[in-house]
């Protein structure tokens, strides 16, 4: 299982060891399935590229703790920014900080991280929710892992709606150290 916050900022390397860039964001399709990773826009000389670059998830050979490995430079695609509608934290529709509500209107928190399997075409497995910095420090963040076949979940542009019964499956992580943006 992978957490999005853990792969942001990781180096992307070719199988021969050549540096390709760093992970800037995760890109999702309209069903919130991971499509690929967006690379930073900086060149080795510090210049900024005009068009974003991305690597499709199926072209990532391995997603490790400290780096992502890709086959070669041909798998790096230059894409139009308009294609990057749904991302974790930089797109038009951002999953990070999106509010999660039950269908009965109870606020469960905001998304601070997302869990998914590293295999291609995997749906989101769960969310880490925050109630604010102080609640995170004193009580821990809450995790909402989705059932095997999540039904009745609405992944909207402004909020995520879940059945009221999902409130019972929230767990608090009291051991999670909250130190900054990456939690």
PLM feature spans:
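Peripheral interaction segments used for macromolecular assembly
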Residues: 1-183
């Amino acid at each position: 299982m992978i957490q999005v916050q853990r792969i942001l900022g990781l180096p992307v390397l070719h199988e021969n060891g050549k540096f390709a860039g760093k992970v800037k964001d995760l890109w999702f399709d309209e069903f919130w399935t991971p499509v690929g990773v967006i690379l930073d826009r900086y060149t080795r000389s510090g210049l900024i590229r005009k068009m974003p670059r991305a690597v499709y998830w199926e072209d990532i050979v391995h997603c490790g703790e400290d780096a992502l490995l890709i086959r070669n430079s041909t798998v790096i695609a230059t894409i139009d920014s308009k294609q990057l509608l749904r991302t974790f934290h930089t797109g038009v529709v951002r999953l990070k900080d999106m509010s999660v509500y039950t269908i009965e209107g109870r606020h469960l928190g905001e998304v601070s991280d997302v869990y998914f399997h590293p295999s291609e075409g995997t749906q989101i497995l769960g969310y880490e929710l925050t109630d604010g910095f102080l609640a995170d420090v004193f009580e821990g963040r809450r995790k909402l892992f989705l059932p095997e076949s999540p039904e009745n979940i609405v992944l909207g542009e402004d909020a995520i709606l879940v059945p009221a019964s999902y409130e019972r499956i929230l767990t608090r992580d009291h051991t999670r150290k909250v130190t900054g943006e990456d939690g």
